Amino acid sequence: MTRNDKRRIRHKRIVKKIRLTNLNNRVVLIVIKSLKNISVQAWDFSKNVVLTSSSSLQLKLKNGNKENAKLVGMDIATKLIKLNQKDVVFDTGGSKYHGRIAALAEGARAKGLNF
């Protein structure tokens, strides 16, 4: 089993838990990480629609390192606060909560999002 297969299995398990326990219909932040960039989408599963998104490509950042991931987190937080969505559920996309994923979460928390 490859590393990517393991990540997909983890992600299915995470999504299943989120859908079962998200009884308040909070917005879900889904993180997509590639080797060079990082992006995040804010999903509302009750309406099945993406509310807003942000990425290192959209912000025209050179790479997806920790500092830029923190900026992406701050950007998505400001967009969600404008939409009056402060309480969210964080979905790591099957990746471990470490490095760029953790930096993105710290940036979002610094701007006022509650996980």
Curated annotation (Swiss-Prot):
Keywords: Ribonucleoprotein, Ribosomal protein, RNA-binding, rRNA-binding
Listed GO MF terms: 5S rRNA binding; structural constituent of ribosome
Keyword Chloroplast assigned: no
The UniProt record lists the keyword Ribosomal protein: yes
CDD domains: Ribosomal_L18_L5e (cd00432)
Family: Belongs to the universal ribosomal protein uL18 family.
Function description: This is one of the proteins that bind and probably mediate the attachment of the 5S RNA into the large ribosomal subunit, where it forms part of the central protuberance.
Protein name as annotated: Large ribosomal subunit protein uL18
Organism: Mycoplasma genitalium (strain ATCC 33530 / DSM 19775 / NCTC 10195 / G37) (Mycoplasmoides genitalium)
